[in-house]
A protein has these predicted regions:
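Hydrophobic alpha-helical connector segments
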Residues: 2-29, 83-87, 111
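Short coil/turn helix-boundary motifs
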Residues: 8-9, 30, 44, 125
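C-terminal peripheral helix-coil segments that are non-catalytic and often amphipathic
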Residues: 21-25, 60-72, 90, 97, ...
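Amphipathic alpha-helical packing segments from all-alpha helical-bundle domains
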Residues: 26-29, 46-72, 81-85, 112
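Amphipathic alpha-helical segments used for helix-helix packing
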Residues: 27-46, 96
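Short, hydrophobic secondary-structure boundary micro-motifs
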Residues: 35-37, 50, 78, 99
């Protein structure tokens, strides 16, 4: 769960960084599963709705962290739903990147790239 993986971090930027790193590692290790998950998100069948609800629940957990970070003055003001969806969207970005890089994908290099662009963009200076 997101709460368990982020509990040890004292600030909200670090919580988001942990989420991003976990997402990259999951895509790296379970590429086929993530491909299925993303493909099942679209559609109107019962299985699609279930997948959508689970994704929305996950995004909701990220949104809560973003909201709390904004309230504590650690994260820039913004649309929490959009920010949380953007962080979730890094799963798709990672999958595309992995397809292009193949076996050469360096998890930590990609993580630092996302940290420098996405996460640091949310940081209150």
């Amino acid at each position: 769960s997101v709460d368990i993986k982020t509990a040890k971090f004292n600030n909200y930027i670090d919580k988001l960084k942990a989420i991003v790193l976990i997402q990259i590692k999951i895509v790296d290790k379970y590429e086929d599963l993530i491909t299925i998950l993303l493909s099942q998100f679209w559609g109107t069948e019962q299985r699609n709705k279930k997948c959508q609800n689970l994704v929305y629940e996950y995004i909701g957990q990220i949104e809560k962290i973003v909201q709390e970070g904004i309230e504590k003055g650690e994260i820039k003001e913004g649309d929490t739903r959009a920010i949380a969806s953007e962080i979730y969207g890094l799963i798709c970005s990672t999958l595309v990147y992995k397809k292009r890089e193949g076996e050469n994908m360096d998890v930590m290099r990609l993580y630092h790239e996302y940290e420098n662009t996405v996460i640091n963009g949310l940081r209150v200076k």
